[in-house]
Amino acid sequence: MRPNKDRQNLWLWAALLLPLLWLAAGLAQITEQAHGLSALAAGLTALLNDPLSLRWCSSTPKFLLAVLVLYPLGVYCYLLDQADRRPGEEHGSAHWGNAKELNERYRNRKDPWQEIILSQNVRLSNDSYRHQRNLHVVVIGGSGSGKTRFFVKPNALQCSGSYFFLDPKGELTYSLGGAMEENGVTVTVIDFVHFRGHYNPVAYLKTDENAMKLAYALVFNTKKNPAASGGENEFWDKSAVMFLASLILYILYESPLYERNLNTMMDMILECKVSEDSYDENRMDILFGELEQRDPHHPAVLQYRSFKLGSAKTLSSIMVTAVSNLHMLQSAAFAEMIATDEMFLPKLGVEKRAIFCVIPDNDDTFNFMVSILYTQLFDQLFRLADSTPEFHGTLPVHVRLMMDEFANVATPENFVKILAVARSRNISCDIILQNISQIKSKYKDDWETIIGNCDSLVYLGGNDYSTFEYISKLLGKQTIRTKGQSIGKGSHGSSSDSYQVTGRELMTPDEVRRMKRSDCLVMISGEAPVRDKKYNLFDHPNLKYTPDYRSPRGLLHRFATPIPAPDGYTMPPDYMAQAGTVSLAYVAELTSPEITEDLYDELQEWEESLL
């Protein structure tokens, strides 16, 4: 707002110069014709009565020149005196922005589907190069504040690109799956509640570094206490990483295609029985020994050899710990999920696709797979953007990650760095929190960096005092005038009023707490905050494809304009049930010699049995 005020003041000073020039010309005329104060006053009165009676005289240039020199000098001295003063902003310049004006600056005028819905009246265009803001959004709202209803669902129904949803309980999958398919988005489901869908992390390993990352994620995301690192724990962790990395590298380079999965890794771990007699060899020792004879510099051999430097007792403890931490891989249903893959992660960057990752909201047993999925998703998309010349480092389809339960699920180790560089690849993240304490406890040193890397913040309400304080400070302080009054009583009573300038939070923590449940706060980097209504889900034209449109629950449907469902359209009864096995078309494209006719026939029979 400051540049606009300065521009207005400049025009005001320029406008004031015109009457001064008129007065100077009038005084020049009067002083030539009149002598004495009375005559001067009479001439000035006559001039005021007839302003157009000015005449050019010999003194006029002198008077005009004096004004043109002295006036700018006087203005300069005045402004110099006022340089360190900001009238009305002495204690803060925070103020509320206008939602509709903000929307005009940031909405997508050409294509309203290519927008992020922040509130009822505020949109943010997906074209980040136009408005110079990244598309990362922090959403803060307590339980029941409407994070899903007022933010996730409206933005998913935009169907503007590719999406990854972390979906506790599967609510989003059921609500949005059919609508997204209706709008041309290919939907894939990986369900860790009912164990449906297929995701094989080994399928995305292309380099030794990828294998090391997977081993690291398996070790640190399955620990009972991930924060307990350093000292003796650090030695055990690094040894476990080397052990798992050696197995994964062997699977990657030496196993047939149909055995390249984590189930094979678990089978290999169970074969590693360490004897206290250093001369006894287990089956893995023999396997890696044969590989070493064939290729002494094989990456799997190098990792296994480094791991075997420990004592027999140490190695045995590491293996027992690995089996304990990875016990979930011994579940038959889970093992079947990770045997094959149908996620096709890189395709999110080149065509409209949506992946729904369903997780239980009361059990974190399989959360380590979400972390691996996040890690590989970023890795695959970054590599696709950087290694495809025609993309010029930017994916052709925008990929958006709706990271619900952000504080309760492990994220990639270098997530802070990923968030900072994702924008240039046309990737954005929606970080969804219940309160600010969650991200503080998870990222003790980096939580401010994460929020700082998100140019938009939406606050939906809640009941956490630390969040109230944070939002209040984020809104800033405004300058207000206060009135003081003193009254003296008695026979000579008197009263006096005094005014002074002081500072006040735009919203105090208590006012943030008492904010209406229908309201939300929207903050975009470099803009004044906006207080607006939460988005009315029933205003979205694609709602007609969802069960929410027909649901009697909720109050907003009473105020919505009815939209008839399209002729012949029926809602899938259970979208998650459509999650099948690996695509036969994909298998047919593979040219690896391990894909035999028998295997292909077996896969075909398997798929037909699911229909």
How does the language model describe each region?
Residues 1-145, 149-152, 477, 488-489:
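Basic- and hydrophobic-enriched, low-structure N-terminal and domain-boundary segments
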Residues 25, 133-427, 442, 452, ...:
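P-loop NTPase motor domains
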Residues 92-94, 119, 131, 135-136, ...:
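General secondary-structure edge motif
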Residues 95-104, 113-114, 119-129, 149-150, ...:
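A broad, low-specificity signal for short, low-complexity segments enriched in glycine/proline
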Residues 179-182, 204-205, 445-449, 473-478, ...:
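Short secondary-structure boundary/capping segments
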Residues 359, 363, 405, 433, ...:
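Short loop or secondary-structure boundary microenvironments that flank
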Residues 419-521:
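Conserved ATP-driven motor cores of ASCE-family P-loop NTPases powering translocation/secretion/packaging/pilus
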Residues 505, 544-547:
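Extended alpha-helical interface modules used as scaffolds for assembling large macromolecular complexes
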